[in-house]
């Protein structure tokens, strides 16, 4: 009984918040009628990207949705995506920041969530001109080739023992090693080690917390109470990962101090140390460690998820697997590990990756954008402060764009010069414009080389052949992954 006045007051505040948020101009994009307080949240289901795709067929490519008190516009066509990300890219360059991202002050330092300004430009410049430049990628490819060799050796051991490989775990470890080699000239983890499991727990913990639906994001008045404990758990995971990254950085700074004449390593960590010591810009240690957090979490989670989807589609379509193996054999011959320089000679491999990204963009709604001012798009007003979600999943399965959109047909990309680098809005898994994913050059290489290494050297079969279509369920979150891990056995014919 004592709690009744508090609950009544809370209900009144929520209702008032909803009423105020709903009193908007009438020339908003069309959409389903929102219920009091909850808006359209009860309509979302477990797969919001699929729900939005269905609703957009009725309401159009610009659609209004109310997520609690958070007014949101869903974009579901390449034409409207181009308007948002290119034509009006500056207006829609803001970010809606989830409560979890406030952990350890990440929202104030992260390049992914900072407003477009001086700090953001400095960090973007480091990524574009130093970290992920073409020359940097070329200089570090020999390190990545070593890590691919380790993946091959692990798969060979499993093959000899008739042991199934959890593709998600193997892809995670390999992706983490490839990123660590590129960034730090080191191997972060070993297969089947305790360190591996700790890294996996932390990074998947961060990704799951950021991706979990949180009432405090839809009703900001609840944020101080953190009713689901999202912020508290995020502080723990973010803190653990930042401590590891800071350890890498501090160790290199100390090594530079004690051995000033030692040759520098050819990796991004040296660039970070140089940036801190020369102080050519206003970036501090925190900016760089939080940048590393973004790259490790975003890069490992999305690349891991996509590799698992690629392997699943190839297993479900054996004729595509055979075609890809034939191409790899013709180009690589007896070589075991693909060289990144061979990628232009492997058009079918490229088509397979594109087709998987079309069907299974790891982040189907991309990172949320926010309108920094009122803007009319396609005759509709998108008001200042509105959240904007680009439904890359819906665009990739649009019948008006793609023939047989639900089928895995890599051949469609052999005849079309469509790429996922941000200029073709039919295929935008990495986003586009000034907010395009900065790690795309590395992710592109990881997806192709890991897939090629697995397919070229082994034939594969499901650990449980009877578990096929029943395992197509997915889990929505930071990245949309398979609900049941893909476990497959490598073997030699």
UniProtKB/Swiss-Prot annotation:
The keyword Metal-binding applies. GO terms for cellular component: membrane. Heme binds at residue 437. Its cofactor is heme. It is a single-pass membrane protein. It holds the Pfam family p450. Pathway: Secondary metabolite biosynthesis; terpenoid biosynthesis. Expressed in leaf glandular trichomes. It catalyses: abieta-8,11,13-triene + reduced [NADPH--hemoprotein reductase] + O2 = ferruginol + oxidized [NADPH--hemoprotein reductase] + H2O + H(+); ferruginol + reduced [NADPH--hemoprotein reductase] + O2 = 11-hydroxyferruginol + oxidized [NADPH--hemoprotein reductase] + H2O + H(+); miltiradiene + 2 reduced [NADPH--hemoprotein reductase] + 2 O2 = 11-oxomiltiradiene + 2 oxidized [NADPH--hemoprotein reductase] + 3 H2O + 2 H(+). The chain crosses the membrane at residues 2-22. Its EC number is 1.14.14.175, 1.14.14.-, 1.14.14.60. InterPro entries: Cyt_P450, Cyt_P450_CS, Cyt_P450_E_grp-I, Cyt_P450_sf. GO terms for molecular function: heme binding; iron ion binding; oxidoreductase activity, acting on paired donors, with incorporation or reduction of molecular oxygen, reduced flavin or flavoprotein as one donor, and incorporation of one atom of oxygen. It is found in: Membrane. The keyword Membrane applies. It is an enzyme of class 1 (oxidoreductase). Keywords: Heme, Iron, Membrane, Metal-binding, Monooxygenase, Oxidoreductase, Transmembrane, Transmembrane helix. Belongs to the cytochrome P450 family. PANTHER family: CYTOCHROME P450, FAMILY 76, SUBFAMILY C, POLYPEPTIDE 5-RELATED, GERANIOL 8-HYDROXYLASE-LIKE. Monooxygenase involved in the biosynthesis of labdane-related diterpenes natural products. Catalyzes the oxidation of abietatriene to produce ferruginol. Ferruginol and 11-hydroxyferruginol are intermediates in the biosynthesis of carnosate, a potent antioxidant. May also convert miltiradiene into 11-oxomiltiradiene. This is Ferruginol synthase 1. It comes from Rosmarinus officinalis. The lineage of its organism: Eukaryota, Viridiplantae, Streptophyta, Embryophyta, Tracheophyta.
